[in-house]
């Protein structure tokens, strides 16, 4: 290379490696209303300052890379870079910090949860300078929210479709989840629906296996729905799982469900993927189907406190991608979930405007600008003795789903469903009369047993069943 060429190449560009914090740590930055804001729990490697760690997260999840590149001069880094604008220590932890990062809106494709996550959590979580990294929360600005359709229908439209008001909805996951023939599966659905439930449900891993192909299941479940509706005079539904190996097959299953005239289908949104989920949500809105969402695989991502992504982020992403129901834990059942934290993301699913509230794990004020809400589903290890607590915790706009708590009734599925319906009606009536469900719950259930032998039998079976384990993921005190 001639000296002349060498001189020209070096003008305005100095090769080498420089600290991330020189470019991406900007504590003086004032966030914009259009920025996507992220709160990361950062655990740096020994010797890495929190400012450098936070700046590295901002850089590697936006415009930065490990070395200076000459093409930086071909764009405006100041316009497009992510910025770590605030750092605070985590209470009770010596080597963890909450690092706040602001991302310009131009970094993200409109209406794409897939692209948003690919940027914010796609690559940086494997960064060697960090021992662990967790995305605790996101603030989605109205300017980005309005590029999404959101839930196919929302809470009010669902209630109008079902003609059911003033109480939580009741559901049941059919068990055993695998191994039943389509006809026996449909029979189990029918017994639950005629007994008083609003919905029955495919479990997350019921797709189209050799023992029960999807088309056969759809037909027998539709028959169960129509027969139960004729007997009870109520609108019934079964969450027909449309999750499949390809998007094309998934849509084909949803089309068949619509042709059968059933009210609702289902999708496993994490294993199925956000692109598939958004496609299905659009189809459901266009064709009048409600969409139930299962969160299978979520705990792989959100269970550990110092690494991964909190479920409140997955819940926000689902509301944007689209779903009318989503499983949200129970607080009192067999699955992980602290009460205040669970109520925090339940509000993020249902409400239009949610204030920042660190006591409930909410790091940012979130304005959904009239995007429809999602109904939280409480499911997993719950039974009739839990009904007062569930009614008090989740309120009317929820689905309370009893799988074993229905099918495990000693007299069969229909009596199990009747027991749950009587318990729910008793709790709702007591609440409406001003009684304290948290304090008087057991008394309310015992009183209802006098009028319902099905409930009395259920109470006897599950009187000693408890799941008393401390949650792994808790709010920082």
Curated annotation (Swiss-Prot):
The record marks 334 as: Transition state stabilizer. One of its GO terms (biological process) is photorespiration. Mg(2+) binds at residues 201, 203-204. It catalyses: 2 (2R)-3-phosphoglycerate + 2 H(+) = D-ribulose 1,5-bisphosphate + CO2 + H2O; D-ribulose 1,5-bisphosphate + O2 = 2-phosphoglycolate + (2R)-3-phosphoglycerate + 2 H(+). GO terms for molecular function: magnesium ion binding; monooxygenase activity; ribulose-bisphosphate carboxylase activity. Residues 1-2 form a propeptide. The modification N-acetylproline is found at residue 3. The modification N6-carboxylysine is found at residue 201. Gene3D superfamilies: Ribulose bisphosphate carboxylase, large subunit, C-terminal domain, RuBisCO large subunit, N-terminal domain. The active site is at residues 175, 294. It is found in: Plastid, Chloroplast. Its cofactor is Mg(2+). Keywords: Acetylation, Calvin cycle, Carbon dioxide fixation, Chloroplast, Disulfide bond, Lyase, Magnesium, Metal-binding, Methylation, Monooxygenase, Oxidoreductase, Photorespiration, Photosynthesis, Plastid. The disulfide bond which can form in the large chain dimeric partners within the hexadecamer appears to be associated with oxidative stress and protein turnover. Substrate binds at residues 123, 173, 177, 295, 327, 379. One of its GO terms (cellular component) is chloroplast. The basic functional RuBisCO is composed of a large chain homodimer in a 'head-to-tail' conformation. In form I RuBisCO this homodimer is arranged in a barrel-like tetramer with the small subunits forming a tetrameric 'cap' on each end of the 'barrel'. NCBIfam families: PRK04208.1 (NF003252). This is Ribulose bisphosphate carboxylase large chain.
């Amino acid at each position: 290379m001639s000296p002349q060429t060498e001189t020209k190449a070096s003008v305005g560009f100095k090769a080498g490696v420089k600290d991330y914090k020189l470019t991406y740590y900007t504590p003086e930055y004032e966030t914009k209303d259009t920025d996507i804001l992220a709160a990361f729990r950062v655990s740096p490697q020994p010797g890495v300052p929190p400012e450098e760690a936070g700046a590295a997260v901002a850089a590697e999840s936006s415009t930065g890379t490990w070395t200076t590149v000459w093409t930086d001069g071909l764009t405006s880094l100041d316009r497009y870079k992510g910025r770590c604008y605030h750092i605070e220590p985590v209470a009770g932890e010596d080597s963890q910090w909450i690092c706040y990062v602001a991302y310009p809106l131009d970094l993200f494709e409109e209406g794409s949860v897939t692209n948003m996550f690919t940027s914010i959590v796609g690559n940086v979580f494997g960064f060697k300078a960090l021992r662990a990294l967790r995305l605790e929360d996101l603030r989605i600005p109205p300017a980005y929210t309005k590029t999404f359709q959101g839930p196919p229908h929302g809470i009010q439209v669902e209630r109008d479709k079902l003609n059911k008001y003033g109480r939580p909805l009741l559901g049941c996951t059919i068990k055993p989840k695998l191994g039943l023939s389509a006809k026996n599966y449909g029979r189990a659905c029918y017994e639950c629906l005629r007994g008083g439930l609003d919905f029955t449900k495919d479990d997350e891993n019921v797709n189209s296996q050799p023992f029960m192909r999807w088309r056969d299941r759809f037909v027998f479940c539709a028959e169960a729905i129509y027969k139960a509706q004729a007997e009870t005079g109520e609108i019934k539904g079964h969450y027909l799982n449309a999750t499949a190996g390809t998007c094309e097959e998934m849509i084909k299953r949803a089309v068949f469900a619509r042709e059968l005239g059933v009210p609702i289908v289902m999708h496993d949104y994490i294993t199925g993927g956000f692109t598939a989920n958004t496609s299905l949500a659009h189809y459901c809105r266009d064709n009048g189907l409600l969409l139930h969402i299962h969160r299978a695989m979520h705990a792989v991502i959100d269970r550990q406190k110092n690494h991964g992504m909190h479920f409140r982020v997955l819940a926000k992403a689902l509301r944007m991608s689209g779903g009318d129901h989503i499983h949200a834990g129970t607080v009192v059942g067999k699955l992980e979930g602290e009460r205040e934290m669970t109520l925090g993301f339940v509000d993020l699913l249902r409400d239009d405007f949610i204030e920042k509230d660190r006591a409930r794990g909410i790091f940012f004020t979130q304005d959904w600008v009239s995007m429809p809400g999602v109904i939280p589903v409480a499911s997993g290890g719950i039974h009739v003795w839990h009904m007062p607590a569930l009614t008090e915790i989740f309120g009317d706009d929820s689905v309370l789903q009893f799988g074993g708590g229905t099918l495990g009734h000693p007299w069969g599925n229909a009596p199990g469903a009747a027991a749950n319906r009587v318990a729910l009606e008793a709790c709702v009536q007591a609440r409406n009369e001003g009684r304290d469900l948290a304090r008087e719950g057991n008394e309310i259930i015992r009183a209802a047993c006098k009028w319902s032998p099905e409930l009395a039998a259920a109470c006897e079976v599950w009187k000693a069943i408890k799941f008393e384990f401390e949650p792994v993921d808790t709010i920082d005190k």
